């Protein structure tokens, strides 16, 4: 069993960039440009970070202050803030650990460190830079904080004797902020990265390791289990607006699992609610996120895998669904939505990835367009059917120099005027932003 156990911590770290270790694997390179106009798109791109090894958060984690004035990023030395008005970079805290998220209520950035046998969650005040301990626990990892910053959510393997990150089975590759998913195919030859990842995910899923999802009450320090299963539980996300609504996924090959689930943490014995049910073999859904208003869960849907692409939405209160069709080149490793809910963004992908896009290495701004009924004639059951639409994709940044083993993880700034992303296009990993409006000279 041990050789089949893929480390849970490696999956968590996709979302949670480490402070210092990521710098170790960075390749020295010439100083990347601070600002330029993309010659293929006409959009302005700026570099927000100073040092290789800097990183913004995973696409569905919040890195912005509640007031929307600052972004927090990880650097080789710790955490820094970016003033979004001036782009001034300032150190926030220097401490080895893992950046978790920024609170939605207070101006606090949370990170986690290991002290002996204890996991310690700390918060640093973005203005005073004072650090405080907010929670301690023995095992597992923290993945989310709720809307009013009263609950942390995390996962843990139930049996402490199970080794979940054995050396030699799955080593981390800090250049790409995820595990080194190397594997051979049936012919003994190395598989492409995307296929090797599926093999390793499947091995971990088939191990059926008992797991628990837990919350820690930051007012009392109490830790309680909210769900237990032998499914591979991962990617916990609290709603940005409902403090007691938790989304999580069943990790593994997407065509093999029912990935998307919601769970209420304020109801005793609450059962998880499945968000999406497949209707065809090889249909996949994942890389889910909440809309900014917390009313909709959006996700990448493919019917079937690698052939037909959608940004799909599930309205939590009503169960109504919306599917926006995406053409192959615009399929993205991760999609995201703007603060006002009117636009989407995507970070593209290379030819080895699931879409096998011949020209997909771009960052995109995506304009959703609903498909109306013909001549205003409504089907009698139209209210109960999926609302269809299409995505009109606009290219923002040429990513031809980017290695997509590092996921760009696009996210909108709070004012909706920029997309922040990370990239190794100039060698070492840096944090960048692209302006959605073109400069007057480029229009």
Model-predicted regions and their roles:
Residues 406-443:
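Blade-level signature of beta-propeller repeat domains, shared across WD40, Kelch, NHL, RCC1
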Residues 61-70, 99-108, 143-156, 237-245, ...:
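Blade-terminus and WD-like Trp-Asp/Gly-His loop motifs, strongest in beta-propeller folds
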Residues 96-98, 112-212, 225-228:
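Asp-box/WD-like beta-propeller blade repeats and closely related beta-sheet repeat scaffolds
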Residues 78-80, 117-123, 161-167, 208-214, ...:
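Structural motif
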Residues 26-46, 202-214, 380-387:
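Blade/loop signatures of beta-propeller domains
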Residues 58-60, 76-122, 136-139:
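Blade-loop segments of beta-propeller domains
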Residues 295-310, 325-391:
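Loop/turn-rich, solvent-exposed surfaces of beta-rich toroidal or solenoidal domains
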Residues 26-33, 40, 44-77, 236:
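Beta-strand-rich domains and repeat architectures in extracellular enzymes and scaffolds
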